[in-house]
Amino acid sequence: MIDSRHDKYLHSVPGLPGVAGVLVSNEKDFVFTSNRGEKTVGVFPYGREEKLEKVRVGGFPNGLAFDPSRDALLAANVSKQDDPTPVTVSMVETKKKILTADIIVPGRTRWTVFDSKMNRFYVNVSTPPKIVAIESKDPDGIAASYDIPATGPHGLDIDTENRRLFCACDQGGLFTVDLESARVSRVSDLSGPPDVIFYNSRLHHLYVAIGDPGMIDVFDTDTMKLSQTVKTEVGAHTIAYNPEIGRVYAFLPASHRAAIYQEV
């Protein structure tokens, strides 16, 4: 845990085997974790990690998204290689701490986001390459899907105001999906295979983490042009973004540090 106001490391949270993702809900003051080492998601109040509770899900969870109006957490699961079991996404009711649905998807998932205007979750599927939509209110199957013409949809975020998704693919391309027309467009090349992406709605910037060669591609989303590249470290494929203070955190595995970047 990092104190983002004072840029200070505080401590680590134990008991989260293979933790792959972390999501903080400002609306509910809760923290959610995807624990890939044991097929669970963790739930605890912000600042009260001793209150950690776990809910078993239908696979090895990776990406997380949350609908605060329904206390609905979606965990996008992955499976182990050569596992014949279908890949699923799991819906968890976080107030009752129960699994409410397990929905089969076409293949291995990556990241996921929640669309508060449509009350839908969008989930990247790596193979076959597509984005699937799942209704938050009635998650009984796939509500819509968008084919992505590139290998490995990975990073995903949403521009709610302009009704579009940003999708960064392992093949090295950045795509947008117009949610009104369903049009998919390749808008730019990337500096390498991406991982996590975040959209800054205040500055209209998109941050794309590139683990090799180790940088963050920054795009102006009004023009969809690359505005700058920021050097991080080889292997730094995970970033976090605090929209309240406009800081990006890049986690540097080789040097065991977190680099902090501020846009003004």
Which residues fall in each region the model found?
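Predominantly soluble domains enriched in secretory-pathway, periplasmic, or organellar proteins
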Residues: 1-264
